Design a protein with these regions (language model features):
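Boundary at the C-terminal end of the N-terminal hydrophobic targeting segment
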Residues: 17-20
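An acidic-aromatic
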Residues: 53-102, 161
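Flexible, surface-exposed loop/linker segments and immediately adjacent secondary-structure boundaries
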Residues: 86-125
Length: 185
């Protein structure tokens, strides 16, 4: 009986050590990441959108959508603008009022990951659930590459938004001008 308890205890400790090690490696990888560029697929309800983005920490993002409206999304770290280039309409948000404020804040992500227990999903991803005020964000990292591979949030209309990112490139030379907010006409 004591042998069984000892074996269970050792297996449990081994599993916890593996999770802790993976978590530490994810944190280290995030600390070394200054920017990332990627393609994405975003699902909001039945609607699927695709495109590409550049994130520069802290809190800057530029995304170009491959859709009929040729939508772009830009944050300069304070504001977030979504522009429909076909009809020239603009949507302006304070970044701090959106879940992207947290996702684009590398320091916040690292601080939260240090406090949280992650879980393995489909033996491929490591997931952390961040809760901040009214925002619940699931972030996913690839177990092999340790890279951020997506997130799940709710939009302002309480629709589930799932963003999967791929073809990820880290620490590329980027044009800082892409984070300038488009001028409203």
């Amino acid at each position: 009986m004591i042998k069984k308890i000892l074996i269970i205890f050792l297996l449990f400790n081994l599993l916890n050590t593996a999770h802790a090690s993976l978590k530490d490696e994810i944190i280290l990888n995030l600390e070394k990441t200054n920017n990332l560029s990627f393609d994405f697929k975003q699902t909001i309800g039945e609607k699927i959108e695709e495109g590409n983005c550049i994130i520069e920490y802290p809190k800057k993002i530029y995304c170009s959508y491959n859709n009929l409206n040729k939508k772009i999304m830009v944050s300069n770290g304070k504001s977030l603008i979504i522009k429909n280039q076909m009809n020239n309409s603009y949507y302006y948000y304070l970044l701090k009022k959106t879940p992207l404020n947290l996702i684009l804040d590398k320091k916040y992500l690292i601080d939260q990951i240090k406090k949280l227990e992650g879980k393995i999903v489909d033996n491929k991803y490591f997931n952390f659930t961040l809760i901040n005020n009214e925002n619940k964000i699931n972030i996913f990292f690839d177990k092999q590459t340790l890279n951020l591979v997506g997130w799940q949030t709710e939009d302002i209309y309480q629709n589930l938004v799932i963003t999967y990112i791929y073809k990820i490139k880290l620490n590329q030379k980027i044009d800082k001008n892409v984070f300038k907010l488009p001028q409203m006409n």
